[in-house]
């Protein structure tokens, strides 16, 4: 998927990310306030890269290299497994579908997928489940591969420490998985249950990977089918009609993906693997009350039209910054945000996207933010499109 970014028009190189991930921006397209004030005293070649804080990612990463501190849930009901197979495979030819299953545990869903004719790669982090999964593999006629690692910890980002380092490129290469163009269909489907404790943090991590076309998204428009809590689901799909739930994370996910609710699963359908190694039903464990909640199965399919000439894996970091800035004071007029964020004429920009100067960020829908960003990027009013206040407090959202 790197190829997608490299094929974009050359002019994007002047206003996009330079360096690894969202950690720095190239001054030719984004300037600090000091840069902008001194624009007449500096030559074009004097510009330099500056760090762009990954503020939502600054949560302590200590969890990544310690043993699992919370129980994990697995599908325990065969009827639920059959329903999941129907949701995952739909009406397509099962043999043409590759399913990556995260922490399958006892392998109830794994067996149901194999029985339906799907190809499965099981990523299992707990050693105790590996022997049973290996026995399934031996009887699966090459349709099952077992990888002993935690899928949610592959390709750690910059602050994270994972031992041993787990790299999707190496794993996928060993499995013979090849990248396809972003414009092609869905090459891989991922099924998993997001860990309750790190649910929001993982949604952010996956989002960064998606927009930067890193990790699993190097291979194309990978479809996620994830069980998440009702709380995070409501935030993920919120619009301005629910201002109490409408947040940056939901805006960015809705811009990136078609989000579809598949079904709700009662907590009694899951078994729980606790740290002591015992497998127990949720309803019998008073110590696991936090896991006694219904989960929502949500499909997140990256949009074929996500990336354009003006929004790409190279400049998505400034799009994130725009949305975060607007939600910092969501009830302030959008024109005030634009005057702080960009050097282009805000009145002209708002006119092009058919918004009034008095409109607020809280009233803007996800697609409005994308149109706003792309209109600014498309503007030829200035070489410098963005002003980045290095000293501003980009607080965690």
UniProtKB/Swiss-Prot annotation:
The keyword Hydrolase does not apply. It is an enzyme of class 2 (transferase). GO terms for molecular function: mitochondrial transcription factor activity; RNA binding; rRNA (adenine-N6,N6-)-dimethyltransferase activity; rRNA (adenine-N6-)-methyltransferase activity. The keyword Transit peptide applies. Coiled coil: none annotated. Its EC number is 2.1.1.-. Residues 1-44 form a transit peptide. Gene3D superfamilies: Vaccinia Virus protein VP39 (3.40.50.150). GO terms for cellular component: mitochondrial matrix; mitochondrial nucleoid. Residues 329-330 are annotated as: DNA-binding. It is found in: Mitochondrion. GO terms for biological process: mitochondrial transcription; rRNA methylation; transcription initiation at mitochondrial promoter. Belongs to the class I-like SAM-binding methyltransferase superfamily. rRNA adenine N(6)-methyltransferase family. KsgA subfamily. Homodimer. Component of the mitochondrial transcription initiation complex, composed at least of TFB2M, TFAM and POLRMT. In this complex TFAM recruits POLRMT to the promoter whereas TFB2M induces structural changes in POLRMT to enable promoter opening and trapping of the DNA non-template strand. Interacts with mitochondrial RNA polymerase POLRMT. Interacts with TFAM. This is Dimethyladenosine transferase 2, mitochondrial. It comes from Rattus norvegicus.
């Amino acid at each position: 998927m790197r190829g997608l970014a490299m094929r974009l028009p050359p002019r994007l190189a002047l206003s996009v990310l330079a360096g690894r991930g969202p950690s720095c921006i190239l001054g030719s397209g984004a300037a600090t306030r000091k840069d902008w004030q001194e624009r007449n005293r500096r030559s074009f070649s004097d510009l330099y890269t500056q760090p762009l804080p990954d503020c939502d990612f600054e949560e302590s990463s200590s969890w990544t290299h310690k043993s699992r501190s919370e129980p994990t849930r697995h599908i325990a009901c065969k009827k639920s497994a059959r329903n999941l197979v129907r949701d995952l495979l739909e009406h397509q030819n099962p043999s043409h579908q590759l399913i990556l299953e995260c922490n399958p545990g006892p392998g109830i869903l794994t067996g149901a997928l194999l029985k339906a004719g799907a190809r499965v790669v099981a990523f299992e982090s707990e050693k105790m489940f590996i022997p049973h999964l290996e026995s399934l593999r031996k009887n699966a006629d090459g349709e099952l591969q077992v990888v002993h690692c935690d899928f949610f910890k592959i390709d750690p980002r910059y602050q994270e420490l994972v031992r041993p380092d787990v790299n999707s490129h190496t794993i996928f290469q060993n499995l013979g998985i090849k990248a396809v163009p972003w414009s092609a269909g869905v090459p891989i489907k991922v099924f998993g249950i997001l860990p309750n404790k790190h649910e929001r943090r993982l949604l952010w991590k996956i989002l960064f990977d998606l927009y930067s076309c890193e990790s699993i998204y190097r291979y194309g428009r990978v479809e996620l089918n994830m069980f998440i809590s009702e709380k995070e689901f409501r935030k993920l799909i919120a619009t301005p009609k629910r201002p109490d739930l409408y947040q940056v994370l939901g805006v960015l996910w809705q811009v990136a993906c078609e989000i579809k609710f598949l079904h709700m699963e009662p907590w009694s359908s899951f078994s729980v693997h606790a740290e002591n190694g015992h497998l127990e039903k949720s309803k019998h464990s008073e110590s696991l009350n936090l896991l006694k909640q219904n989960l929502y199965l949500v499909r997140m399919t990256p949009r074929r039209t996500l990336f354009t000439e003006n929004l790409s894996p190279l400049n998505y970091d400034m799009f994130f910054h725009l949305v975060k800035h607007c939600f910092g004071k969501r009830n302030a007029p959008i024109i005030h945000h634009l005057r702080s964020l960009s050097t282009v004429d805000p009145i002209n920009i708002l006119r092009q996207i058919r918004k009034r100067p008095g409109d607020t960020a809280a009233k803007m829908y996800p697609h409005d933010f994308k149109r706003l960003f792309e209109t600014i990027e498309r503007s030829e009013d200035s070489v410098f499109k963005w002003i980045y206040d290095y000293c501003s407090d980009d607080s965690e959202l």
